Each structure stands twice: as C-alpha cells, then as structure tokens.
A protein has these predicted regions:
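Glycine- and Gly-Pro-enriched alpha-helical subdomains that act as flexible
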Residues: 197, 204-226, 231
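Conserved alpha/beta cores of soluble small-molecule-handling proteins
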Residues: 1-197, 201, 230, 235, ...
Length: 305
C-alpha cells in the first residue's frame, strides 16, 4: 500500500502495544491453537471472496458489552446472506466467553469473531461449491485504546468514495467485504487525516470508514439516518444514553455545511467507545461538554453492561 511519508499513525482503532498478544490462543473451528499456528484454508470463502459476517466484542470488568445485541446482529447478518452458522446463539456466546477465559482475560480485551461460509472446492464466488460447514474463528487480544486519540481528537477527511445504497450493497450488514471503507481510509490517510468521513449516495453525511459519526449543534446530538451506514451497536447505545440524560437527539440527513459549523463532533465504535473529532477537512472543531458527558455515560455503561 502506498502511503504518504507523513501518514498519521492515529485512529479510533489505535491501541497500546501488549506483548501478551503474541502468546494468545485463537479459537479455530472448535479448537484453541497458539496465534502463530492459527490457520485457515486458502480455499475458504472468506479469503476467496469476503463471504462471511463478523462481530467485534469488548470485555470490561468481566462482562462483554452489549453481548446479546452483538450476537443478534451476527445472526441477522448470517440469515441475510443465507449462511448457516451451525451453532445456537448461546453456543456462539460460549465460544466468545471461552476464548476470553482461555487467555485469562477479564478486562481491557477485545475479540473479533469471524464466520465464513466455509471451504470451497475451487476458488470462485458461487456458494454451491462449498464443501462442509462454516469456518468459525475468534481472536481475542489485550486491547486498551491509546490516550492520544481521546486527548487530541481525530482528524477526518471527506472521501470521494460514497457509502452505497441498500440496493447496491447494504452497509448495515457486518460483512467481511470492507473494500470500499478501506479505499476511503487510504484516501484520508494520504490526505493527512486519521480516518475518512463518508457521504451517502445523496451527498449527506453518513459515517466514517469504521465508526459512526455524530455532531453537536445547539446542544443537540445529530447523527445520520442510519440508512447508509453500518448498524452500530455503540451508536444506538449512545443515542439511548443521551435521551435518558435529557439530551436532544436527531437522526436524519445533514450536510457538510451543517457539519462544518457544528460545535462538537465525535465517533463511536466498540473498541474506542466515544472518540472526539477535532478537525474535518482542515476545519477545527472543539472538544466540548456534550461529548465529554456522553463519554462518561458510555464508560459507566460499559463497566456495568
């Protein structure tokens, strides 16, 4: 990948290095194997064509944040693409729990649960060439977000790559195929930003490449309609917490012009929770009281959820 020599090293996904991650055990189709020995077939549908669904899960104080919601979203996505996971929801939750437990993790950890359609007879996109059942992998790592992104905030760049309409590719589906988001992120990095802000097919603000995007105007919290972005669980939780705290929320279309004149901005995601945004397309935005309040509310929720 060709990146600018001045490319940013900061993102909402940035985390503190932890040597313990070199020794983690990875769940692969019912077995736990050392990270260095974890393997899947080169004929796996996820590798061949990005055919699969996934979830990111955060462990805080021995609890997986919004566990039921994540598992529900996983199964909804699998049904959408006619993928039989072959396990019940409880069995999937047990896989995640056991992966954390086998690695001695109780706090400050994050797991990526990945399920693909399985191995193919030949490398093509046709699901009729699948041999056997799905491939299920769970990677748990010690992950604590770096303080830098929270303290200085993120710099965003508005990408020319748009979020697609549902009749093209429904981005509310948490699929393995993320190429459009990756392209947008590369464009943003080469423009000197940390992450990409993306518009919907009609030119309204949609989301960032890996997080949901919010602004604050007149003390109210605004976010997109949700029609053209991933169905963020942290997003929905933050909206609920804001309403419970008496903060006005608005889900709907808004323009770049309205975003540029916002008082505050922030992004949400499973790993980073709430991360402030301090610059979009070179225009400064302050880290303000609404973002700080919501960050506190969400951290308290994650510690108890």
């Amino acid at each position: 990948m060709q990146l600018s020599p001045q490319a940013s090293k900061t993102s909402s996904q940035s985390y503190q290095a932890d040597d313990r991650n070199e020794q983690v055990l990875v769940y692969v189709n019912g077995e736990f194997v050392p990270r260095s020995e974890a393997r899947i077939s080169i004929f796996d549908a996820g590798y061949v064509s990005g055919d699969g669904v996934w979830e990111g899960l955060r462990l805080t104080n021995g609890r997986v944040t919004s566990f039921d919601a994540h598992v529900d979203r996983l199964f909804e996505g699998a049904r959408t693409i006619t993928l039989n996971i072959g396990l019940s929801k409880q069995e999937v939750k047990d896989v995640v729990r056991k992966t954390f437990e086998r690695n001695g993790m109780v706090d400050g950890a994050h797991a990526r649960l990945m399920i693909t359609r399985g191995i193919k007879k030949t490398p093509n996109q046709d699901p009729r060439f699948i041999v056997g059942g799905p491939t299920i992998v769970c990677v748990a790592e010690h992950k604590v977000v770096t303080a830098e992104a929270k303290q200085r905030g993120l710099k965003l760049f508005t990408s020319t790559i748009r979020c697609s309409a549902p009749d093209v590719f429904d981005l509310r589906l948490n699929s393995h195929s993320r190429l459009n988001f990756i392209q947008a992120l590369i464009q943003a990095i080469n423009a000197g930003a940390d992450e990409a802000l993306m518009l919907d097919p009609h030119g309204f603000v949609s989301s960032c490449n890996s997080t949901n995007f919010f602004i604050v105007r007149g003390g109210a919290v605004w976010t997109s309609s949700g029609k053209y972005c991933f169905n963020g669980i942290t997003r929905s939780t933050v909206l609920r917490l804001a309403r419970e705290a008496g903060i006005t929320t608005r889900e709907g279309d808004f323009t770049l012009a309205e975003m540029y004149s916002a008082e505050e901005a922030f992004v949400t995601g499973t790993l980073g929770g709430i991360t402030p945004v301090t610059q979009v397309d070179g225009r400064p935005i302050a880290i303000g009281p609404v973002t700080a309040k919501l960050d506190g509310l969400y951290r308290a929720y994650a510690e108890q959820a």
